[in-house]
């Protein structure tokens, strides 16, 4: 589910997506990016 990390990972304002990426990888995704301060898994 691409939204696995939306509520679990906060997105910083300026491109610090590491937390989002790590969360997404933990759920088996390739990584993640932030859109509108929400983490989206790719």
UniProtKB/Swiss-Prot annotation:
Pfam families the UniProt entry points to: Toxin_17
GO cellular component, as recorded: extracellular region
Location in or out of the cell: Secreted
Protein name: Potassium channel toxin gamma-KTx 1.3
Comment field on protein domains: The presence of a 'disulfide through disulfide knot' structurally defines this protein as a knottin. Has the CSalpha/beta fold, which comprises one or two short alpha helices connected to anti-parallel beta-sheets stabilized by three or four disulfide bonds.
Expression (tissue specificity): Expressed by the venom gland.
A single MF term (Gene Ontology): potassium channel inhibitor activity
Lineage, highest ranks first: Eukaryota, Metazoa, Ecdysozoa, Arthropoda, Chelicerata
């Amino acid at each position: 589910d691409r939204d696995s990390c939306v509520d679990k990972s906060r997105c910083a304002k300026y491109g610090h997506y590491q937390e989002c990426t790590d969360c997404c990888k933990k759920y088996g995704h390739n990584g993640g990016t932030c859109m509108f301060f929400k983490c989206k898994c790719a």
